[in-house]
Amino acid sequence: MTGCSAPAETSGSRKMVDPFGRNISYLRVSVTDRCDLRCFYCMSEDMTFLPKADLLTLEELDRLCSAFIAKGVRKLRLTGGEPLVRRNVMSLIRSLSRHLQSGALKELTLTTNGSQLVRFANELKDCGVKRINVSLDTLDPARFREITRWGDIQKVMAGIDAAQAAGLAVKINAVALKNLNEDEIPSLMEWAHSRDMALTLIEVMPMGDIGASRADQYLPLSMLRARLEGQYTLTDLDDSTGGPARYVRVSETGGKLGFITPMTHNFCESCNRVRITCTGTLHTCLGHEDASDLRRPLRASPTDELLYETIDRAIGLKPKGHDFIIDRHNRPSVSRHMSVTGG
């Protein structure tokens, strides 16, 4: 009696596990490096953006995302720049939603500055997006303009209103900035919680030349948390979100507050994510200069086998942890900008 042998494992069916046993199930994809704001901790005011010809087409982005989903990605986040300023980006989101319908993908989401949500919130909901992150560092209109260099906070507020009206869950991300918005964190938190939105605080990360010293902007969240504990009752939560944030429940508001602390307490031991830039470069670590070109194998063959092999090699080189430091001599730890990598 002859037994049936198991089918041979192919690169496409092989799940992504790095050298340290971490299963890669979360993909962040920057669909553009362009943004309609110029937040000073992210990019310089006269930022030179990539030539549009260098960007992957929307069809190529779809194929790349689909390849990663075939290899075990269950959460896909679109980022930028500002993802919603990419021309025809909704056609990509609508196409990717087929993976939600098939059950291959558990979550399709995005991080946005909120400026385009009035236009796109309902369509995002129709495409199966259930939750989004909105980057907002202040509630003060003048301070918002200072941080973003020319932004209109009313557009963002209207966008948040539109997102919630469409049925999207919204989480607010705020970068903690020394001597700029640190005094406003309690009121920002109370506002977010009053709107049934979690707030996640993020330390400044040393990525890309921004024409200013990040040492002047850096505020350790351990210090900020200690201040908050003087005003509020914070209870640690054992939320396993697969992300870098550590959450607490704020008794006085009933809401959730997250801390992302790459500088003071890294999150590398549980890292389950990789990033793809809008030019098709794969970065397996936010805080390393590692890079694997996926555009070449993507365009070299109409089938995905070469692409899968390139992905497997890159995952096999994923480092154990990042190299972030705040350099008093104003040198970024990583030369590429967050807007290119995907924030």
Swiss-Prot record:
Its EC number is 4.1.99.22. The keyword Transcription does not apply. SMART domains: Elp3. It is an enzyme of class 4 (lyase). The keyword Nucleotide-binding applies. SUPFAM superfamilies: Radical SAM enzymes. Its cofactor is [4Fe-4S] cluster. It comes from the Bacteria. [4Fe-4S] cluster 2 binds at C268, C271, C285. GTP binds at R28, R77, T111, K171, R273, V274, R275. GO terms for molecular function: 4 iron, 4 sulfur cluster binding; cyclic pyranopterin monophosphate synthase activity; GTP 3',8'-cyclase activity; GTP binding; metal ion binding; S-adenosyl-L-methionine binding. GO terms for biological process: Mo-molybdopterin cofactor biosynthetic process. InterPro entries: Aldolase_TIM (IPR013785), Elp3/MiaA/NifB-like_rSAM (IPR006638), MoaA (IPR013483), MoaA_NifB_PqqE_Fe-S-bd_CS (IPR000385), MoaA_twitch (IPR010505), MoCo_biosynth_MoaA/MoaC (IPR050105), rSAM (IPR007197). Keywords: 4Fe-4S, GTP-binding, Iron, Iron-sulfur, Lyase, Metal-binding, Molybdenum cofactor biosynthesis, Nucleotide-binding, S-adenosyl-L-methionine. S-adenosyl-L-methionine binds at Y41, G81, S135, M205. Residues 19-244 form the Radical SAM core domain. It catalyses: GTP + AH2 + S-adenosyl-L-methionine = (8S)-3',8-cyclo-7,8-dihydroguanosine 5'-triphosphate + 5'-deoxyadenosine + L-methionine + A + H(+). [4Fe-4S] cluster 1 binds at C35, C39, C42. Binds 2 [4Fe-4S] clusters. Binds 1 [4Fe-4S] cluster coordinated with 3 cysteines and an exchangeable S-adenosyl-L-methionine and 1 [4Fe-4S] cluster coordinated with 3 cysteines and the GTP-derived substrate. Belongs to the radical SAM superfamily. MoaA family. Monomer and homodimer. This is GTP 3',8-cyclase. The gene is moaA.
